């Protein structure tokens, strides 16, 4: 079983408009509301792939109830209730553009943070892999992911971390390391304080930096150019075919789903990397975030090339 953690979920609201007019009324006919957050995208893709998934995070108010009630029944909902209202994130789709309005989310109390920590420990009993995705809610310290990873490691669970900024830096500088991190080039550049390119020799060198010591897998997204990965002392380039992209939103989360599935099933390096990239590509071919059409899985799987470099 795979446990997905979304500490700062949201209701994602989509407002499609022919034209966004400022300082006046804009009427929307076709409104879409879905449970949002990186970890919930991971949950949905794992569920569609056929994995057993348990989803947790911090939710509150009517919007928190909406998230719980609108996840597929086959996803085990194990969310922790807080006093604040779960945030709403609005995407206005207009004239080929996407304007986003993102709420910060609720402020968690010390008691709520401690309560979730105990809740997390309890949920580990029957899982093999834990995914930790997205931003931390207000009130949580930057090193909170580090705390959850330490608990997971002590219980013999594999962890996949997909976050950025201070939360990622705190984990890299901490004592307890995740099994996998999945930065993109921009996030890698931010961590290292220098601009990184798709040059394989340069990537090889930086991924051996002491900053990444103790992390078994480092999987760097190169966007449409695939992936550069390090597993222990072996490096891989994953070459992916060109596809028609409908929406790339959520493709990174779908890739995390593939990584988690590969770890849960003890797959070899090539199988794990191939599965992860196929699920990311399948999501990019769909309008709905966190959704994959499994009918196209085998064809794409055969087109992925994983090379040791």
Swiss-Prot record:
Q: Which gene codes for it?
A: lacC
Q: Which GO terms describe its biological process?
A: D-tagatose 6-phosphate catabolic process; lactose catabolic process via tagatose-6-phosphate
Keyword Repeat among record annotations:
no
One GO term in the molecular function aspect is: phosphofructokinase activity
Name this polypeptide is given = Tagatose-6-phosphate kinase
Q: What class of enzyme is it?
A: transferase
In terms of CDD domains, this protein maps to: FruK_PfkB_like (cd01164)
Give the protein family: Belongs to the carbohydrate kinase PfkB family. LacC subfamily.
Q: Which domain of life is it from?
A: Bacteria
- EC annotation from Swiss-Prot or TrEMBL: 2.7.1.144
- The entry's keywords: ATP-binding, Kinase, Lactose metabolism, Nucleotide-binding, Transferase
Pathway(s): Carbohydrate metabolism; D-tagatose 6-phosphate degradation; D-glyceraldehyde 3-phosphate and glycerone phosphate from D-tagatose 6-phosphate: step 1/2
Q: Name one GO cellular component term.
A: cytosol
> Reaction(s) catalyzed by this protein?
D-tagatofuranose 6-phosphate + ATP = D-tagatofuranose 1,6-bisphosphate + ADP + H(+)
């Amino acid at each position: 079983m795979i446990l997905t953690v979304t500490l700062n979920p949201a209701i994602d609201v989509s407002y499609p408009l022919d034209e966004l007019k400022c300082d006046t009324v804009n009427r929307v006919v076709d409104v879409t509301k879905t449970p949002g957050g990186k970890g919930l995208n991971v949950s949905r893709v794992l569920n569609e792939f056929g994995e057993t998934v348990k989803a947790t995070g911090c939710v509150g108010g009517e919007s928190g109830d909406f998230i719980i009630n609108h996840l597929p029944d086959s996803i085990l909902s194990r969310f922790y209730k807080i006093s604040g209202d779960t945030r709403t994130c609005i995407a206005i789709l207009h004239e080929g553009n996407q304007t986003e309005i993102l709420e910060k989310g609720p402020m968690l109390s010390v008691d709520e943070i401690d309560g979730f920590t105990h809740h997390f420990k309890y949920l580990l009993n029957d899982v093999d892999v834990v995914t930790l995705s997205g931003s931390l809610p207000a009130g949580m310290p930057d090193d909170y992911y580090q705390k959850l990873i330490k608990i997971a490691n002590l219980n013999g669970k594999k962890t996949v971390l997909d976050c950025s900024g201070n939360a990622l830096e705190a984990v890299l500088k901490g004592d307890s390391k995740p099994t996998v991190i999945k930065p993109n080039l921009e996030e890698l550049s931010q961590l290292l304080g220098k601009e990184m390119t798709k040059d394989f020799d340069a990537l090889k060198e930086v991924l051996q930096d002491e900053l990444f010591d103790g992390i078994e897998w480092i999987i760097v997204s190169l966007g449409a150019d695939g992936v550069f990965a390090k597993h222990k002392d072996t490096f891989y380039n994953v070459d992916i075919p060109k596809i028609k992209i409908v929406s790339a939103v959520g493709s990174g989360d779908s890739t995390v789903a593939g990584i988690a599935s590969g770890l849960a099933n003890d797959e070899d390096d090539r199988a794990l990397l191939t599965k992860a990239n196929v699920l990311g590509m399948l999501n990019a071919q769909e309008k709905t975030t966190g959704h994959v059409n499994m009918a196209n899985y085998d064809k794409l799987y055969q087109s992925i090339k994983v090379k040791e470099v």
